[in-house]
């Protein structure tokens, strides 16, 4: 354990950079920008209940409108957001550190050779302290919630994905999620299941059903639940 309740199975510098990422949401049909410096403000955080894990913090993370733009329904959608999920307390930890400049990328004068920034220090100092041990599992948790009208009824679709490290092979959950998806897409291209060329979009060009079935064969399952809401 550590005060962050977080260890990294990918690039720690990337985690630090994500704490400064600007976000664009659609709220009540209008685009709303959340600058990176306001990402961890209490007003921008909410809690979600993830099956099997309990309460997690949802923190603004990136341009949600990008996805609705690509799928062609930004003009009709009412609300959309994109969040990182973390254990409770993540935002409260980073909020004061960001305010004090610990994630600035400007070198600090008279510190070493004058080329070291606070971000550099946070990266080099913390990264080796946040490494998983051989008997520890990393977790990948994804939650997607969609609400709309289906067959004349207001409906909510909840899709969840949960991956954990395989201690027998040592393969990290993050590695499994990223690598398996890339391998499946590459095989689809080789087998002509995807005929388009050039830069492709997972949202548009990858056949959903065979892709999800291939993930399932590798132990990665997306669970979907539909429920009818009161009008």
Tell me the role of every PLM-derived stretch.
Residues 1-231:
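C-terminal catalytic/substrate-binding lobe primarily of soluble NAD(P)-dependent oxidoreductases
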